[in-house]
């Protein structure tokens, strides 16, 4: 509810820039805090040694996979809910909310069980070296306990956000993240748990977020979760697939990309793995604002598409891209200037810093391109353009990155590893532009058809 205006009226009639910023701010805060608690693990574990830092980076690829499951059900069910609320079909939205939530929780339990059974082979598959393996196993066996909480929390978070209730989602995510940051130094150093202490801090934070988000579904205009509304059907899972497969593709490929990066960097030692892990965390934190802005755009996009308000949808997209690009240009300039100090905060190792600075500066060069890439992916995903959304989701860390991480190091050595993401971003941007142009031309035709029917 926004100043006594219901969500439908607010999202389809209030000034676009005001709506997007209002929707985006809670999401940006959630993304930033989540990014900070990911960085907190790296920061505090970095005080142990380089191998511990590298181990967290290795397990991070598993976290991408678990997040992929949560985003699959969260975006899949949430995008459907958004369109159905925009079209005033509330009963469909209510059943989808519970179906998405319980399905994601069950998948998290399966990941937990299989991960614990195959702990050592999984650690090696993710890119762990013999010197890193003991740290990786200590960290991973605890992190897996949080899989059901993480998948279902991400589902609830995205469902609430796509209903236009991002403030409720923010409260749950932020509380868990802050608790994680507080617990990290206590469990790692005070209680002497080392790298497993960082994992316990993360799991406890995820469990708290889960409980709060579940309680938040009963507040405001949120759709409450009830097992009686759990209605699995082929049609509902088909809708979840259409809306969620781009997110699963994006996160799943991020998992494979991180594994591939660890393997490629591992050829140059543990310092290279640690450096690339640190750069990845910094990049993720930098993108938090742009992703949050894009997620603020999504409920506007879903409601407007469901209501047939194509001009408003186009205006919202343009605003999102311009603001996001402007922000990333500023980050690019600042990051270039302080890159050495930034890497040094996490690991005061000259070799790690030297590798990290080069990799970070390469990525900074193409940062501004990512606003259009991300917004276009969210546009296609929310408006049920699954194949385009999947292609765009696969581009940055799959279609281009994975082949490049094997090709570039073969020709340029360590520099090939460091420049890989930047080269992938250029190719992704080149692919995105014609796809988004075609999509808006399609919207123009759809608008004309709606007018003809009226």
Language-model segment annotations:
Residues 53-113, 150-169, 275-339, 370-389:
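Small-residue-rich hydrophobic transmembrane alpha-helices
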Residues 27, 31, 43, 60, ...:
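Transmembrane alpha-helix boundary and packing residues in multipass membrane permease domains
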Residues 32, 36-54, 123-130, 186-193, ...:
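Helix-terminus/linker motif at the lipid-water interface of multi-pass membrane proteins
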Residues 65-68, 180-185, 210-214, 285-288, ...:
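Hydrophobic transmembrane alpha-helices of multi-pass small-molecule transporters
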Residues 22-41, 142, 153, 176, ...:
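Transmembrane helical elements of multi-pass membrane transporters/channels
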Residues 11-43, 47-48, 64-76, 80, ...:
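N-terminal transmembrane alpha-helices
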